[in-house]
Amino acid sequence: MNKKRLFGYLFVLVSVGNISAQESRLSAQEYKLWYDRPAQVWTEALPLGNGRLGAMVYGTPATEQIQLNEETIWAGRPNNNANPNALEYIPRVRDLVFAGKYLEAQTLATEKVMAKTNSGMPYQSFGDLRIAFPGHTRYTNYYRELSLDSARTLVRYEVDGVQYRRETITSFTDQVIMVRLTANRPGRITFNTQLTSPHQDVVITSEEGNCVTLSGVSSLHEGLKGKVEFQGRLTARNTGGQMACADGVLSVEGADEAIVYVSIATNFNNYQDITGNPAERAKDYLVRAMTHSFTEARKNHTDFYRRYLTRVSLDLGDNRYEHVTTDKRVENFKQTNDAHLVATYFQFGRYLLICSSQPGGQPANLQGIWNDKLFPSWDSKYTCNINLEMNYWPSEVTNLSELNEPLFRLIREVSETGKETARIMYGANGWVLHHNTDIWRITGAVDKAPSGLWPSGGAWLCRHLWERYLYTGDTEFLRSVYPILRESGRFFDEIMVKEPAHNWLVVCPSNSPENVHSGSNGKSTTAAGCTLDNQLIFNLWTA
């Protein structure tokens, strides 16, 4: 079977819904990513998440590193970035486009139409959990795994004849990160652990009850002071041995077993309100999580996760290469008919959406929920000219419909902030969203005109609302979102103009995202009547 045919079969299977939803079929296969060495760089770490918290587990025996995220740690604060000069200059840009002076139009738009206050805020890392194990630099029989069946990582290795095991979950039900440390001989669990952060001016303290706290605030960016306050709390529960806490370091010596707990919380309530108490929230998560055993916590977590996972299975045959590490299977894929790797990849995609988008939280951003930087590429925002939409394309067709709730709430919120932007920039009713937004739900045109002069982000997101109705037949949902659809349609009804050559109604100025066109001799993206806009607006008006 060649690769084109294999992926063609996969596409057909997904498209027509020929995917069994039987728990027994899924249980017969084991879906996991596994490796025989620790991660060397962040992109090799294994992702865990519960929608709100993200963790990237490196699995290094001597110095475990788990990079941590909390979904509401973003730079900046509530704001609107619409440029009031746009109202005057958009007609001038439009005239230049209709005159065929595309590059001149694009240059003017960059100078006078695009946002001048900020281009949206970056999603930011919280920091890292570090766990140091003295004497574990020389190890053998190493194994590292991400189980897609149970949403947990496992690390095993051997030092001086002792077998060590680490199991990590980002609990869906307890909303904390837990790391269970065990060995096959008593009294062998000894480690020091602490929280670190790339943020400036963080405060790290040791509190009574063997607890370490790390408190900070998000970053200044493009002149907008960070106002998201956050706190992480670190503690442990040991069986046997001794535990102590001083100078921001938690130490356990000679234990039979230990559970490390991390909770993180912020002051973020919604895009307009950041008056929450991160310390109280973080403490509450931790206290509630420690009222039951790790075994119970893991079962609750796994049961919650599998309610989503087991709705859909994809069986492409035997796992004939199960003895080969995942990185080698990917490398060998050109030469092998590894159909089970395709099925694993399918479930991995579902896994990532389950872990990065849960009802009540934020949508999955450019990097889902995982980011190790303060200023990541493209700010790890919500890019609405295909990326945000792509995150959610699998949601309905793979039976994860309710995971759209964070996306739908974002759409509802930008439909409110976008009303002001439509008025300020276009003098229009309805609402507009350009090619990017962030946690503050900015809707102005950002970056430079070649990428950002595109007012159809709202129309594309509205398609997701309509598809929810098509998949579910939920008339109550449709009734609740109809005003959003109507007001997006109203905006385009008011801003579309007749182009002079044919009197066609078009959106102008706009662009086909990141595509230059022949009319400009390949020098400009700025144009009128782009096919993408035409299709999106047709879909919106005929929904």
Regions found by a protein language model. Name each.
Residues 1-24:
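Bacterial Sec-dependent N-terminal signal peptides
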Residues 22-450, 456, 462-469, 474-475, ...:
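Aromatic-residue-lined binding/catalytic grooves and analogous aromatic/hydrophobic interfacial grooves
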Residues 481-482:
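Hydrophobic, well-ordered secondary-structure scaffolds
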Residues 492-494:
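Juxtamembrane membrane-interface segments at transmembrane alpha-helix termini
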Residues 498-503, 513, 518:
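Catalytic activation segment of kinase domains across protein kinase-like and atypical kinase folds
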Residues 515-543:
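Carbohydrate-active enzyme catalytic cores, enriched for enzymes
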